[in-house]
UniProtKB/Swiss-Prot annotation:
Binding site for CoA: K97, R104
NCBIfam families reported for this sequence: PRK03525.1 (NF002914)
Residues of the active site: D169 (nucleophile)
Record's keyword terms, sorted: Cytoplasm, Transferase
Pfam families, sorted: CoA_transf_3 (PF02515)
Family classification: Belongs to the CoA-transferase III family. CaiB subfamily.
Class of this enzyme: transferase
Catalysed reaction equations from the record: crotonobetainyl-CoA + (R)-carnitine = crotonobetaine + (R)-carnitinyl-CoA; 4-(trimethylamino)butanoyl-CoA + (R)-carnitine = (R)-carnitinyl-CoA + 4-(trimethylamino)butanoate
Chief location: cytoplasm
Full protein name: L-carnitine CoA-transferase
GO BP term (any one): carnitine metabolic process
Length: 405
């Protein structure tokens, strides 16, 4: 297979990935593949572009490194072109409502007829099967959080709150990425394709698993946070200093011992409630939990962030200042690792945003292209799979494809 023009880089060089989906979840999987060197083709509707394009800046990050194909994949010759593309595709990712592709005649079996080794990842809110009440419902970030038990655990004691920005979308996209790569590993061993059913609510069910395990095994559900503090453990979570906020984790025998000396609670060490060797203070079960919080709050409020960080570094207590976004660029760790970077958009502007992650030592990722325009690569992609200029123009004239003006 001849690949589309692009530099060769990263651990996934030579891999062809195609995705169909809008907004964040499915495309985030495509973004990861593209930044790790895969050739990634982004399918958009002919009449309506991906709704993410209305955002002024985010799409320049989320759609960089992609090849844009505008094709009606469910109708007539457009469907034929899509199935021909599948013959040269390693991984196909689609994000839709339940078994939307199967309902429109593009089943796993149809795809495997054209490519027996194809990895197919279906990403939806409620999965490819289940009850009629839920399976075909639309879902976005907050829907998946609410249905999974994740949202109810977040927020404050007075009110649950969804985790932003768009946590369920990003977790689900990463799940699609890792699951597709796991399937591809097996396909290369067996020669038999795989279909993956990724339900966003099940992804978030796993993300919310920590506290749920107590309830599922005969215990009580943990209460929500109070002002950003860990609902289980004292000395863990968000705290206010004299000049701003920090997060900290008071974990470890030595850390607790020395911290208690600083905040005036050394007399509690070695008591039945806080015996020698204590590594965590349970906020609820330990009767001194509220007192620990009261003393720690008072001590932190009397010190600046710099003073707290210096002292906690001496005690080996994990902590960090809560950074504002404007502080990120000048932070020395960000600068040293080039965590924020710049690239050129297709119209020649400079765009700034998060760099590629993670950092591969021997086969690093690369930003080689900005977000393509609607239908920008349609002609090149169709030519790549054997279509002539006349074939392409016929698809365009029938409204089944869009090429760049």
């Amino acid at each position: 297979m001849d690949h589309l023009p692009m530099p060769k880089f990263g651990p996934l060089a030579g891999l062809r990935v195609v995705f169909s989906g809008i907004e964040i979840a499915g495309p985030f999987a495509g973004q990861m593949f593209a930044e790790w060197g895969a050739e990634v083709i982004w399918i958009e509707n002919v009449a309506w572009a991906d709704t993410i394009r209305v955002q002024p800046n985010y799409p320049q990050l989320s759609r960089r490194n992609l090849h844009a194909l505008s094709l009606n994949i469910f109708k007539d010759e457009g469907r034929e072109a899509f199935l021909k593309l599948m013959e040269t595709t390693d991984i196909f990712i689609e994000a839709s409502k339940g078994p939307a592709f199967a309902r429109r005649g593009i089943t796993d079996e149809v795809l495997w007829q054209h490519n027996p080794k194809l990895v197919i990842a279906h990403l939806s809110g409620f999965g490819q099967y289940g009850t009629e009440e839920y399976t075909n419902l639309p879902a976005y970030n907050t829907i998946a959080q609410a249905f999974s038990g994740y949202l109810i655990q977040n927020g404050d004691v007075d009110q649950p709150m969804p985790a932003f920005p768009y946590t369920a979308d990003y977790f689900s996209g990463l799940t699609a990425t890792t699951a597709a790569l796991a399937a591809l590993h097996k396909v290369r061993e067996t020669g038999k394709g795989e279909s993956i059913d990724i339900a966003m609510y099940e992804v978030m069910l796993r993300m919310g698993q920590y506290f749920m395990m107590d309830y599922f095994n005969g215990g009580e559900m943990c209460p929500r946070m109070t002002k950003g503090k860990d609902p289980y453990y004292a000395g863990c979570g968000l705290y206010k200093c004299a000049d701003g906020y920090i997060v900290m984790e008071l974990v470890g025998i030595t850390q607790i011992t020395e911290c208690f000396k600083d905040i005036g609670l050394a007399h509690l060490l070695g008591t039945p409630e806080i015996p020698e060797g204590t590594q965590l203070i349970h906020r609820i079960e330990c009767p001194y939990g509220p007192l620990v919080e009261e003393k720690l709050d008072a001590w932190l409020a009397a010190h600046t962030i710099a003073e707290v960080k210096e002292r906690f570094a001496e005690l080996n207590i994990a902590c960090a200042k809560v950074l504002t976004v404007p502080e990120l660029e000048s932070n020395p760790q960000y600068v040293a690792r080039e965590s924020i970077t710049q690239w050129q958009t297709m119209d020649g502007r400079t765009c700034k945003g998060p760099n590629i992650m993670p950092k591969f030592k021997n086969n690093p990722g690369q930003i080689w292209r900005g977000m393509p325009s609607h239908g920008m690569d349609t002609a090149a992609i169709l030519k790549n799979i054997g279509y002539s200029e006349n074939d392409i123009q016929e698809l365009v004239s029938k409204g089944l494809a869009k090429v760049e003006d």
